[in-house]
Design a protein with these regions (language model features):
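N-terminal plug
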Residues: 38-40, 48-96, 101-104, 114, ...
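A beta-strand signature from Gram-negative outer-membrane beta-barrel systems
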Residues: 121, 133-177, 733
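Transmembrane beta-barrel wall of Gram-negative outer-membrane proteins
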Residues: 217-363, 388-390, 606-609
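Gram-negative outer-membrane beta-barrel transporters
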Residues: 677, 682-687, 703-801, 878
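Outer-membrane beta-barrel signature, preferentially recognizing the C-terminal barrel domain
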Residues: 374-395, 538-551, 599, 617, ...
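Surface-exposed extracellular loop regions of Gram-negative outer-membrane beta-barrel proteins
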Residues: 117-118, 360, 365, 421-423, ...
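C-terminal beta-signal and adjacent terminal beta-strands/loops
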Residues: 742, 782, 793-802, 827-881
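Signature of Gram-negative outer-membrane beta-barrel scaffolds
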Residues: 321, 357, 450, 454, ...
Length: 881
């Protein structure tokens, strides 16, 4: 991205944020003059000054620096996933498949709770659940808290996102919706496909044919088959002989959602209710671009780009260099909430949430690889990934009126059990190379073909209890809180790798290697003296198990110290233990030996926030807190994982420490109308032992790992405006302008960070200097129409921090996110006495590209990964019965 473009967009967002409050002030400050026809207006009366709280939205009522995302906000943006909707919030950015960055900090510094309970992640490489799993139809609101409160988990860095599922409504209904969309780089274009088999694979449900065959389950290590050729032959032939990738036209994206509620009013104020919702979505995306890896000095290791084919000496088959990937995504989600209320003071609620996503991937990379210098190589991968998260929570709320000054006691309790899983029942990789006679042949080395099976299971059990006591003491409002938490988490991962390799003494002919894999690995060529034998090439570090236990307690108080000054202070105590068991990888000293990581530590975490209402509808907040950031269980294991999106290997670090963070916040807030506000805030954070994702040598190439830097700081400014103006102010005599309103929602965040790591400094990994959002549109509640133009900007950020290896530091990998320009419109029609909501949306109007790159000491720059993002056109229809 050019500096001019960055500065221009940042200036646009900043000017919108700073000038809109002036317009609002002018509108507020211009009351109509009294007229003679209004006798009361010209009467002389005594001056009466009334001071009171005008609280137009929930954001002001909170005791913390926070933003609230409501159902109305989601309707304005037209977002289908909660991650997309959160990207519109001040200081938030969404990276990859729904991972939230708050104030430019990486997803590791973000916490997510659902109805008060933490959630496990179905991603082995991530510590938090991806928000693209959550359709907006299942979420009622989201509170984004940027200052820490003692009732929440102590792992807090950038912010906490508290999601709430839809509550039991006040009336019964049945709602249905459908959508269809097309993306310019994918829909109707040729995609890459392979036969997953099974009757339900077209909706993302695989049959047993993708699982590890029963024959191999007898002994997955194959060790007992070593002296039994017949058993070894049977094991090889039991694997599915599906390898090839074919081309076919991509379908458009589509989706359906259904929700309904039932209410039953019983006698004596007892009320039963239930809410259910289900959502299904299908999406297919093509990605075509370049991938490269570089040496420290900028020399090329792997070149997967069109330029690689130019170096093939004029061979006619040296075409199509670069990478191509097609991913089909099937999402099936369901929510059930059932509750009972007793006289409005007591409530029991059972909530069950199921989020399931399946991805079928086909990848072809063609170019120059360091494993075959000077030869064009074609690498292909078939991948099937099933992710699922299931959360079950039983909760209660009980209110008791007490005969004392603090006269209202509320008791909230919850018991939650959640599971997350990620299964890769079938992943195949194989390589061909273009040899000097212009023929592609399967590579002869041990890496010519591999078949993987892996499974990850994550269980989370949590019990929470909270007490809230409200009342008046000495004519001052006071709220006391206390509570506790017990959480247990277990994670298990297991993987198996297999490869067909030539039997002892067998040389595979060049002619056989020139055929497709289905012929090369046909049953006739497996076992005995035929050619290939199945080998187990599993690494000892492909297995790990981990546990974590947290016990916590907190107390806090919110007190009106003097008139217009509220102070909230508290402290949380957390005691935790993390245990990870794995093995030393092959190729390293002590390969196969067990290795354990144990982190046991306790913390006192103080927090305080002061809110001063120094003027009508204005207030100033100051906040301080101490928080922590633990390594994830995955990050403490040295097991190797493959990042399917970037095709990069990743390994944890058993020597990681817990990071400690000091947080300071100052924010001015002005509420000048219903759902209208302006804010300007300053923030500062200091880190001890911050955990950073690094780019470093792994095996024969480069990959990702984690390490503690020495210290880091982050400072920044954020501003926000939410402003609505009736259009008839501009043209009161034009009928079309009647009842129409123009709204502007804009925010901008500038932040600067510095990490001290060994002998050099840099920005925090994942932190963007500039973030900005702009929503400009109009709506007519009477005509039930609305249109919104949305802009989302995220500045460059370090994707992977380079580390010092020997006497040289590897260059950082820098990510350049696209500028996203979207247009959303909706209209409600009445047909046959029923309302129908019709929506249209255009996403990524600019057709931006995605890029990650490295800059070298000699002034050169290399693209690590780059591809074009298409423009998406969507239509939706929904109705309620």
């Amino acid at each position: 991205m050019t500096p001019t473009r960055t500065i221009g967009l940042a200036g646009l967002l900043a000017s919108t944020v700073l000038t809109a409050p002036a317009l609002a002030w002018a509108q507020d400050a211009a009351p109509s003059a009294p007229t003679p026809q209004d006798p009361e207006a010209v009467s002389t009366v005594e001056d009466i000054v009334v001071r009171g709280r005008f609280v137009p939205d929930v954001k002001r009522e909170t005791s913390a620096v926070a933003n609230i995302l409501t159902e109305e906000d989601i309707k304005r943006s037209g977002d289908s996933e909660i991650g997309e909707a959160l990207a519109r919030v001040t200081g938030l950015s969404i990276v990859g498949d729904g991972y939230v960055y708050v104030r430019g900090l990486g997803d590791r510094y973000s916490s997510i709770v659902l109805d008060g309970s933490t959630l496990p992640s179905p991603e082995p490489l991530k510590r938090v659940v991806p928000l693209d799993l959550f359709p907006t139809s299942l979420v009622s609101n989201a509170q984004i808290q940027k200052t820490y409160s003692a009732q929440y988990p102590g792992e807090f860095g950038g912010g906490l996102i508290a999601l709430s599922t839809r509550a039991i409504p006040n009336e019964r209904f049945l709602s249905f919706g459908a959508s269809i969309s097309a993306e310019t780089e994918s829909t109707g274009k040729e995609g890459l496909y392979w036969d997953a088999g099974g009757k339900l694979s077209n909706i993302g449900i695989a049959d047993n044919s993708l699982n590890l065959p029963n024959f191999i389950k007898i002994d997955p290590s194959l060790k007992s088959f070593a002296n039994n050729p017949a058993m070894l032959q049977g094991a090889g032939r039991s694997l599915r002989n599906i390898w090839s990738i074919d081309g076919d036209k991509n379908l458009p994206d589509f989706g359906f959602n259904l929700s309904g509620a039932e209410i039953i009013d019983l006698s004596n104020g007892i009320r039963l209710g239930g809410f259910v919702a289900a959502d299904y979505d299908y999406q297919v995306r093509n990605r075509e671009g370049v991938r490269n890896s570089f040496e420290v000095n900028g020399g090329v290791n792997d070149q997967i780009s069109p330029g690689a084919c130019d170096s093939a000496g004029g061979l006619s088959n040296a075409t199509g260099c670069g990478f191509q990937r097609t991913e089909q995504e099937y999402a099936l989600n369901a929510l059930g909430a059932f509750g009972i209320e007793f006289n409005e003071n007591h409530e029991l609620k059972l909530t069950t949430l199921l989020l399931r996503k399946t991805r079928q991937q086909a990848l072809i990379e063609r170019g120059l690889f360091s494993a075959d210098p000077g030869l064009i190589r074609s690498f292909q991968r078939l991948n099937w990934i099933e992710q699922q998260m299931n959360s079950n929570q039983l909760s209660g709320r009980h209110v008791f009126m007490l005969p004392m000054a603090l006269d209202r006691l509320q008791v909230d309790w919850r018991a939650a059990y959640s599971t997350a899983s990620r299964d890769t029942p079938y992943r195949r990789e194989y390589s061909y190379r273009l040899e000097p006679d212009n023929v592609f042949r399967m590579t002869p080395g041990s890496d010519s073909n591999r078949t993987f099976f892996s499974a990850l299971e994550d269980e989370n059990t949590e019990f929470g209890l909270d007490f809230t006591l409200n009342g008046m003491i000495a004519d001052r409002e006071i709220t006391l809180k206390a509570g506790g938490l017990h959480q247990e988490r277990e994670r298990d991962f297991a993987s198996r790798r297999y490869s067909f390799q030539p039997a002892a003494g067998v040389i595979i002919s060049p002619e056989l290697r020139s055929f497709v894999p289905e012929i090369i690995f046909s049953p006739d060529n497996i076992g005995g003296d035929a050619g290939y034998t199945l080998r187990d090439i599993t690494d000892p570090s492909d297995f790990f198990d981990a546990t974590m236990e947290i016990n916590a307690a907190y107390v806090s108080a919110e007190v009106e110290v003097i008139r217009d000054l509220r102070v909230t202070a508290g402290v949380r105590y957390e005691d935790s233990e993390q245990q990870v068991n794995s093995f030393i990888p092959l190729g390293e000293t002590g390969a196969g030996d067990p290795i354990a990581a144990n982190l046991a530590q306790d913390f006192w975490l103080p927090t305080a926030t002061a809110t001063w209402e120094f003027a009508d509808n204005m207030q100033l907040r100051f906040g301080y807190s101490k928080t922590i950031n633990r390594p994830d269980l995955r990050e403490l294991s040295n097991a190797l994982f493959l990042d399917d999106d970037s095709n990069t290997l990743e390994r944890g670090n058993p020597n990681l420490k817990i990071a400690e963070i000091q947080n300071y916040d100052l924010r001015w807030e002005w509420y000048f109308g219903q759902r209208q506000s302006a804010t300007i805030g300053l923030f500062y954070k200091s880190f001890d032992n911050p955990i950073e994702r690094t780019y470093q040598p792994i095996g024969e190439g480069f990959g990702r790992s984690f390490q503690n830097a020495q210290e880091a700081t982050l400072k920044g400014v954020e501003a926000e405006i939410d402003y609505t103006l009736p259009m008839d102010v501009w043209a009161p005599n034009l009928t079309w302008f009647q009842d129409n309103e123009v709204f502007v929602v804009a925010n901008v965040t500038w932040s600067d960070s510095e990490v001290t790591d060994a002998a050099y400094t840099r920005a925090l990994q994942g932190q963007s200097e500039w973030l900005g959002n702009l929503q400009f549109g109009f709506e007519n509640p009477t005509a039930r129409r609305r249109a919104t133009l949305l802009v989302n900007y995220q500045g460059e950020r370090i994707s992977d921090a380079g580390i010092i290896t020997g006497s040289t530091r590897l260059p950082d990998v820098v990510e350049t996110p696209p500028i996203l320009l979207d247009l959303v419109a909706s209209q409600t029609f009445t047909v046959g006495g029923r309302d129908y909501d019709v929506g249209a949306k255009i996403e990524n109007i600019l057709g931006e590209e995605y890029e990650r790159s490295q800059s070298f000491a000699n002034g050169g720059k290399g693209v690590v990964e780059g591809y074009k993002l298409g423009t998406t056109f969507s239509l939706s229809l929904s109705t309620t019965f």
